[in-house]
Amino acid sequence: MAKRDYYEVLGVSKTASEKEIKKAYKRLAMKYHPDRNQGDKEAESQFKEVKEAYEILTDDQKRAAYDQYGHAAFEQGGMGGGGADFSDIFGDVFGDIFGGGRRQQRPSRGADLRYSMELTLEEAVRGVTKEIRIPTLETCDICHGSGAKAGTSPVTCSTCQGAGQVHMRQGFFTVQQPCPHCHGRGQIIKDSCHKCHGHGRVERYKTLSVKIPAGVDTGDRVRLSGEGEAGAKGAPAGDLYVQVQVKSHHIFERQESNLYCEVPVNFAMAALGGEIEVPTLDGRVKLKIPAETQTGKMFRMKGKGVKSVRGGVQGDLLCRVVVETPVKLNERQKELLRELGESFGGAGEETNSPRSKSFFDGVKKFFDDLTK
């Protein structure tokens, strides 16, 4: 069966840039990788075809020869039996894209971990230290990360002599490729560790003490360097990122460095003025309510908000007044309110109800305009 054109295989034009070729390869390799298509021989064949096309078209010399001679340029010795390494999609697919596929593979850094931590508003504002328990991969304490049975060590690969690469004949060229025997590592484990089964790492839970700085807010994250998964074969560990989520508060609402709350005031105090206690994160403080205060009036208490973890000045506490209508009145109270209401006169009395006068004046004008 005739081979398909390499450009056609990757779905790119013959003038495609290396960046375009790499992008196409990444997409197709992810699509056809055997780990995603287990038992699908056709997908495996397409994966090999995509890999072969990528290796030719990202090598300047090979691409020039292919553009001039086509597949005939590589018929002597074929692809040298290099085949496709399906062991790790990230090592295989992304290794070539970022240059790792053409040199000896290095042990990979451990993966980063993420943990979502829920805090109360008080904890977020003041800072807190909490213990967390997370699943992770740690270096095996039996083989110390080598993957080899206790008392033994990995041996040098006899195929590549420890280089991790072999020279393969491909048409007019001799090129280096990752060793198919040791997968580019340069070493072979003959007797695997009984605990980690040759992986060098084991799954376990670990407990950490995490210090959350004062002033954090939802969306902030704290990085713990080196507390992620252990790296393979002695490589550095990844990091742990603790993502902060602040729970809603029954009194305060936070907006950046400011806090907001609603303060209920009875109608008598709102009319005559007075003093009430309002809560802050540091305790209760007195707030003076001037006479004739209306619902929605905002009072600012300087420095009673939050100091952001990023620095800057302390925020403020903004208290919004809500004038309450009295309920469950006894007969005496109702009588007094009737007398008070009668003393106000009609809705048009500007002196007692300026907003009501403005409203009813507007209503009267609206209907007057309709009847003109």
Curated annotation (Swiss-Prot):
Cellular localisation: Cytoplasm
Gene3D superfamilies in UniProt: DnaJ domain (1.10.287.110), Heat shock protein DnaJ, cysteine-rich domain (2.10.230.10), Urease metallochaperone UreE, N-terminal domain (2.60.260.20)
Binding site for Zn(2+) 1: 140, 143, 193, 196
Sequence ranges of the CXXCXGXG motif repeats: 140-147, 157-164, 179-186, 193-200
Domain J: 5-70
InterPro entries xref list: DnaJ (IPR012724), DnaJ_C (IPR002939), DnaJ_domain (IPR001623), DnaJ_domain_CS (IPR018253), HSP40/DnaJ_pept-bd (IPR008971), HSP_DnaJ_Cys-rich_dom (IPR001305), HSP_DnaJ_Cys-rich_dom_sf (IPR036410), J_dom_sf (IPR036869)
NCBIfam families (alphabetical): DnaJ_bact (TIGR02349), PRK10767.1 (NF008035)
Free-text note regarding domains: The J domain is necessary and sufficient to stimulate DnaK ATPase activity. Zinc center 1 plays an important role in the autonomous, DnaK-independent chaperone activity of DnaJ. Zinc center 2 is essential for interaction with DnaK and for DnaJ activity.
Role, per record: Participates actively in the response to hyperosmotic and heat shock by preventing the aggregation of stress-denatured proteins and by disaggregating proteins, also in an autonomous, DnaK-independent fashion. Unfolded proteins bind initially to DnaJ; upon interaction with the DnaJ-bound protein, DnaK hydrolyzes its bound ATP, resulting in the formation of a stable complex. GrpE releases ADP from DnaK; ATP binding to DnaK triggers the release of the substrate protein, thus completing the reaction cycle.
PANTHER family, alphabetized: CHAPERONE PROTEIN DNAJ, DNAJ HOMOLOG 1, MITOCHONDRIAL-RELATED
Name listed for the protein in its UniProt record: Chaperone protein DnaJ
Species this chain originates from: Photorhabdus laumondii subsp. laumondii (strain DSM 15139 / CIP 105565 / TT01) (Photorhabdus luminescens subsp. laumondii)
